[in-house]
Amino acid sequence: MPKTTKNKNKNTTPKSKTKKYLESANKKSVTKPKKEQDKVENLFDQPFLGEIKKNILKKTKSFNSKKKETVKSKSKSPIDFFDETKRGVFIVPPETDILSRRELNQKTVVNTVPNQTSSYPTINENKLVELNNQPETKVLETKKDSFTTTIREKKLNPEDSQAFWYIFVGDRKYGFWKNHTWVWLGYFDQLQRWNYFKVIETVEVPQEHAAFIKQRPADIDFWRPLVGNPNYGFVQNNTWIWKGFFDKKLNWIPDPVRFTEEALGHTDSLVDEIEKKTISEQPYWEQENDIVVTVFNTKSLASSLENELLLENSSEEQPVIEEVKPRRNEVIFRNPVTKLHFEKEKFEFLNPVKETNETIPLIEIVKEEVKVESEVEAPVEIEPEAACEPETTIPEVETVFVYEDDLKGLDSNQTQAGNVPEVETVFVYEDDLKGLDSIIKDDQQHDEIAKHVEHLSQDYSKEIKDSAKADLSNISDDIDSVWKEFGSFTDETQKSVEEKSQVDEIILDANNDFINESLFRDEVVNNIDSQINETVSEQQFEPTYSVNEFQQEFSEPVVSDEKIKETNSDESVNTDLTALFSEKLVNEVLLTNEYVDVNAPFSTETEVKVSSELPKSELVDEITFINNDPKPQEGLEYKVDFLETEPKSLFDEKTTIVVESEPPFIQPDLSLELDSVNDVDKSLETKTTSVELNHEEIGNEFINLDVSEKEVQEQPTTQLETDSEFVLPTYQIVEDSFTESAETPNEFSSEQKDTLEFISQTQEVETSESNVPTVEQETKLFEHQDENNLFTPLPLDLTEIIESNALFDSKPDEKESSDSELQPTFKEIKLDSTVEVPQESSQVEATFDTVQPEAVFDEIKTQELQPEATTEVVFDDHFQPDVQPEQTPQEAKFDSPVEIPQESSQAEFHAEQISDEIKLEEKTEAVFDHQQLENQSEETVVTPTEVTAFEPETIETQLEPSSEDQPSEPALDQNHPEIVTAEVEQIFDGTKLEDLKLEEANFDNVENNEVQPKETEAEITFDETKELQQETSSEPLSTEELKSEATFDNVSEAESEAVFEKPQLETQTEKILEEEPKSEPVDQLITEASFDTVKHEAVFDKNQTQTEGLEEPQVSSEAEVVDQTTTDTVGEPEAVFDVQPEKTTEVKFDDVENQQKVISEPQVEQQPGEAVFEPSAEAKFDSPVESVQDSQPEPVLEEVQTQPEIQPVESQPEATFDTVQPEQTPQEAKFDSPVETVEQPEFSSEPTQQHVESEASFDEPNYDFDEPNYDFDQPSYDSDLQPSEPQYDVDEPNYDFDEPNYEIESKPSEPQFEPQVEQQPGEAVFEPSAEAKFDSPVESVQDSQPEPLLEEVQTQPEIQPVESQPEATFDTVQPEQTPQEAKFDSPVETIQEPQVSSEPEVVVQPNFEERKPETVLEEPQADEIQPEASEEESLDWELLVGNNSYGHYEPDGEWVWAGFFGDDQKWNKDATVKWARERDYLPLIGDEVYGRYNNKGEWIWYGFYDESGDWVLVDEQWKNRQPRINEAPKFWEKLIGNEEYGYYEDNEWNWYDGEFDSEGNWLVFQSEETENLNEDITKDIPALEGYDIDSIDADEWLSQFSADDAKDVFGSNDKK
């Protein structure tokens, strides 16, 4: 963890410290110097933490051990890695403790500079920006003694010199973990400003270490195989240098620091702004006017860069910039060096080794130079030895830095004085120019000097030959004015130059690279410092030129306010300078060090050409600056091919930045600007050479070591600055800037912001497939984080990531699971007798083994209903109606009219949609009991076309699944399957979502109206059936389609007039219809489509003819539909009817007529779960009904077909259960066709009792039609549809399990709801005979599916006045009950009891209703399903939470509804609300652009995909994407609800008395009160006596007791 100093304040918490720190930063106050006690490792020794440790009541003992371990690890500082003395030799990868941002936020982050006092201002990025925008900004005042630690100090305190960016590791704003590697989303420039990548760069994250870690995690030397791997480091001077480091968890963390032109340009502007400000007193520079002219050979400069002249600049003597008025009108380049750019020549960085190969002792050069300089008129000529010329490929371009003072004192001769080889960097220091007053006086001379500079820049390829004479007359007028401002120079300048020349030795490393001992050796430093003191004036200026400009061929001299124009100096002068510089820069650098030892910034400027080592120095910044030795430093080293590129205005930007950022860091004497200049120079030099930057390089590695030259150049500079004292200041700056940036986002350019956003959105964390964390691995992650910090994202193996939690909380999974669970699978459902329904449309024949619906529903539930996939549904005779609501299709038992809440059906069932999706053709095929057929034949006309349309898709797709899946109501005879088919068809025809609403009609009414089912049947229209057919045909495979199929188009009575072939059905239907005709509305008929008729297997003659062909296919398709719908229904909790007729009973058929009219069609649509099935009229719901049932957990019994035409059936309040009873939890409504499901519950209550006996056989047939469970639902729907009018007695259960039903099965896709049901959803009456048969199926359906939809079952999607439907709700059917719970209260009982007596009128036609599994038809309507719940249901909407059909969970765990419940309790789906399935998120798990892992390893999403597929962020903090040091993830939010941390009281979460420590450990404070409380507890709980309560883990303690023991301890009443 990064070692950052922290003010230790026992009285303040870390949070308060952070606030104080931020406030002080805002006030531009300097933080107090770091003290020993402020170290992170000492933080935990503070009394308040110690006290907490003693008094806390840990929930888990492991927390304590982990905490202790963590504390111990903190005490370990990576001294070896950061010890400068070992950097050149240390090979073991550095291991560092990364201080998480959270922890950092809780602790005061003080400047890491040890000797810094709070009296000094803190320079941050905001300050820099401010300076940049306000040239007149005053320079912060600093005291002489306020300077950053020297390199030597850093050696002594390596901990304090850690990279500033350590604290950002683990912060999701800055990067993400990938395969045990921290991947940065951007980089830090030399100003330590964070920059997001503008373009997502190809990040080649090293992967090798992850493999080694996995193979031998305990192997300390796991890194050895990585030595030599270019992804992890590089070799320099036979030393392996790491580009990053490994943290305690062996995660690889690269260095994010880069040198950028952009940052340099910023420094330039800052420099210009600062020019008017004087450099603070520099203890060694006593002469204000002294200007030192230092000519550096590029070679020597490069080599010195290896040695890091910047280090010299950062030497203890560095002056700190103070606010001083310019002396003598010195507008002098505020930066010690006036930047003269060589337009034609590009500065190139030499390889430090090459550069150092030949070095001529600077002493000689300096001597010559000093001599020349001493001659005011004659430029100092330094003839480099033969070695003077760079052996390396150093460009011949000379870089001349002229300080204002230097220019003042320079004569043209002096300008010539430096005879440096081809490339020369000329730094003119005040001291050097002090004696050149005469030159300054001569404007022409000044011009000449300028010309020299310009010429040198132009003729970099030319070596400056010895020429002591340089014409300064060519210097630009600007320079003249500047010189004038400077004033005359004294001879002291010459003196200083001479003194500089006195240096006798050049220190070279093994590579012949110049070693600047001034920084490292006290003796040398002393010598140089003394010389500098004499030679350099306090007013040294950092170079104003920017690296960019250098790279730009130094096209323009950058002289801030004093615009010095570069004039072509005489070639001779250039030659002289070139010759002088061609001498090894090392020598010159040495001189420079001697000259400006304290004036390191000048030397830095001189070294503007930073060799690659400059980055080293930055690395060193963590510990030391680049080793003076050319030896590579251990820190990361950037191999800067890009560094080799021309430096661009490195100095300027650096200088400016340094001035602002370094003041707290710069040694008191040296100005910040000078330091920055030095750093810049080194950075340039680093360019010439490969840059070693431990951390910097790591950062680059993340990006890729190969960076543009600009970046390289810039990076070295930054590194130097950071490596020198500037690093610590930079850290402060970064911190402040980020902190402020949080407040002032404008700090980041909009471009950066865009980049950040782009990155955040586009950056994908590369994770192995295992990146999706599993629950098990979540635990691992949690533990892992406990070891580290809960606050820091733990680098996870790909496996870990995969194992970690899914995108959303478990909730998204729950949705999908609910979908799958809710959707009954019918594939295993088998009916002993296979009914082969003639399929006009290609519909799968549903073979109905006489299987009890329950068994079928179970399997159906497991099977996702796939409307498209049509499979034969075989109902085993053993199929049990008892089905879990979700499994309803198979298990649903139509004990009483069981509504199978069909999730998808409820949501999706709309008469229109269903008809569209489910082809009514099949519905027309629906076989109605002859009675119903007769009655419905008049009113209920099943449009063959609709049926046909409905049949093909629904039947094909759904019938088979329904037949397979349809458990077939218990005791379904092989004949019953046929009947079931008819029922299903009726249900679909009659019931739509609206019909389902009819279903809501009280089943009591249905019972009362059961006498009317015949009329209803007669009236049954397949309008809904048509719609269902249409829907089914259009979308036979989708749950919605199934639902739509389940619900019938409310076909006009004429259309819905389906005659049940079976005489029994006809007889019963006739009776019922006779009463039902009262409610003639086809819609009602459809809604009321009585499953009774369906049960009777009677096929409407008209419909049969048309429908029969269709019905048979429909039965198959319907079964298929049921499967599909069930599948969809699983997705949609809607019409899942627990084969509990009681809920269906809730549907009141009294209002059936109204509902039938209003609701029959609309209801079906609106209330997919409410498919209302009129027992008689809709008795025959062909495959559509079955399919609906399949789609809906609740059998199509709702008789989605509830034929609105049967509105007259009001007497028979055929509570058409919209197979889609949205109110019923879609999840519960597993039967895709909620309508059928609803109806069944209704009918099931009464007819179940009546027809329970017959239902045993009919149920299976119903399932045959319905996709297993829907058959059950259908009967209940029938009862719902018809209960109001003729509430058929159990007698009506005598649904003829006649093959007509099977024929109907062929039609199941177009279940025809008898008009009765549609007419009066409240009255939904199931013909006793039909229902009797459906009763068992209904029971099974109900068992399998909750029938909350039953009330809504009145499938009259169009008829939204569901209110009437609720009236029609059968008491047995309780649609509002959660679809899962949807139980047909009385209907279930009724259904369970073969006797329909409870609701005699409600005749559950087991065949038809079971066939109603066609509610699957409504499956397609799952989206449309409008959970239309009765008033009771409205109270159960909470049960729908988590049902994917009704909404979804956001990443933050918030449940978002996909619609709303209207006043009529109908579910109104909001088409605009869409969400992505979890599978859409799985590939993103582990990508920290999209989320993060919390302290328990759970994946937390930042946003979600909206309906347009766009990623929408919900984390406001993340939206800004601006790093905030004090920003900590709200990991604790996920702990809400965890009883280990608190408890709920009055629906409000209360935390235990405690808090999270910096590591995310939960600390429960124990006060005296708690101790007393514990004492009281011991009294209450004698078993606790004798225990050390303070150390007791309650959970652990309780775990040793059994339930009986707990009773003994806590009492029999307390089961806890």
From Swiss-Prot:
Biased composition (Acidic residues): 1256-1270, 1288-1302, 1416-1433
Compositionally biased spans, kind Basic and acidic residues: 1012-1029, 1059-1081
Annotated segments matching region 2 X 26 AA repeats: 891-1389
Domain of life, source organism: Bacteria
UniProt feature, compositional bias: Polar residues: 1200-1227, 1242-1251, 1276-1285, 1353-1380
Comp. bias intervals (Low complexity): 938-952, 1309-1323, 1392-1406
Region (2 X 32 AA repeats): 1205-1389
Signal peptide: none
NCBIfam families: EAGR_box
Task performed by this protein: Could be an accessory structural component in cytadherence.
Protein name, as recorded: Protein P200
Organism: Mycoplasma genitalium (strain ATCC 33530 / DSM 19775 / NCTC 10195 / G37)
